From Swiss-Prot:
PROSITE patterns: UPF0054 (PS01306). This is Endoribonuclease YbeY. Keywords: Cytoplasm, Endonuclease, Hydrolase, Metal-binding, Nuclease, Ribosome biogenesis, rRNA processing, Zinc. One of its GO terms (molecular function) is zinc ion binding. Its cofactor is Zn(2+). It comes from Thiobacillus denitrificans (strain ATCC 25259 / T1). GO terms for cellular component: cytoplasm. Binds 1 zinc ion. It is found in: Cytoplasm.
Amino acid sequence: MAPELRLAVQFASGADDLPSRAQIRRWVAAALEHDAEITVRIVDADEAQALNRAYRDKDYVPNVLTFEYGEIAPALLGGDVVICAPVVEREAREQGKPLGHHYAHMTVHGVLHLQGYDHVDAADAERMETREAAILKRFHIPHPYHS
């Protein structure tokens, strides 16, 4: 049985070509391994940088930030995924990827972080990248780390 998902999607960006709520829901659900209550918020650079500075003590604009709340109820994972629209747009352009593919990747990447995946060392990065690629393949999206 698929994990239960309670999802809120917030658009706080002036970008034109944002994914739909339905697309975001599909990407989140595909990456989910546990019942969860998640907010995905798409923001502009100022908000992403302010959050990165306030919560990670890093003064740059990230592509995605994840705020894990752990179990907010028995067996219910909680957290926020914040995606910076201008950075995702720039990276997609620089990498020659369709914008929707890169939004899917950043969404999946953030949801995996909520579930404990990371890329601190090579073994963890390989595990996370393999999982990302398998999820994205379901949407006919090529491996995000291979050209």
